[in-house]
């Protein structure tokens, strides 16, 4: 059941609709890790209609984005284990742009997979760096019978840690219900109408 909250209908206009659109997408996929450009183009058709939908208590835009987000998250969830199943090439120089605000959504599933590969490589490298530092410290402090783990072992442990972190992340995401995602609309920094799912 949907209940209409108290809000000033005059404040809902195309400008507010555009703000809600951008803020909502930022809150559910701000790092542009799930949606594709084709999704964004489809969502953009609603950019100036959200105000009307809120007034009419029409959840078409929310339903579309919610279902697509779940689909895209499932696609990525099935991808990360494969990307972490083999060692990364840390000799290859690559860059990873973390200025998500300026980025576009990935053009295709292939470009999204490449983005995830780089993100997972960066995460694994960070864990690996910590493991190497820890090993070097143990070498300095230990007795002669301490045997340092090899690079291969440390790299595999780092990938395992990254995989476990991803498993925890997706477990958390999978525990969220539809209403939790719907609440994302209401918790933006904007003054939105109160629309409750009961």
Predicted regions and their residues:
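Stable alpha-helical elements in mature extracytoplasmic
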Residues: 16-17, 21-24, 65, 69-72, ...
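Conserved small/polar residues in nucleotide/adenosyl-binding loops
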Residues: 188-194
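Short acidic, glycine/proline-enriched loop segments that cap or flank alpha-helices
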Residues: 7-12, 150, 154, 173-177
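Cationic-aromatic interfacial patches
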Residues: 1-143
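Short amphipathic alpha-helical segments and their helix-coil junctions
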Residues: 1-6, 162-172
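Long, low-complexity, polar/charged, intrinsically disordered or flexibly structured peripheral segments
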Residues: 139-152, 156
